[in-house]
Amino acid sequence: MKRGELYRVRRPPGDPKLARVFVIASRQPLIDSTFSTVVCAPVFTQYHGLPTQVSVGTAEGLKHESAIQCDGLMSLEKSRLTDYVGELTFDKLRELDDALLVALALPARKQASI
């Protein structure tokens, strides 16, 4: 299990859908620990171009063009993340990082000077 992997979760808590895809947003040391939950962001089929959304699609293993919704973070039991869908590329992980910064109102990362 790695940060940036997408999993289909059956009957997510508080969600009317029978299944929803989530991407793991937690840092890798937490994922590798004995802690039972990880922070995940849900994936929805609608993309509105918000700075808290990341567009994803067939390249990430999904059937349709969709969007990671960083405003809807949830803590999910690792044991529920069993139906692997795909994973984000390095560039998509960077987009996820940027969207999480906006969603959590964190200061922007400083650019490295050359």
What residue spans do the PLM features occupy?
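Conserved functional hotspots at enzyme active or ligand-binding sites that engage polyanionic ligands
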Residues: 1-114
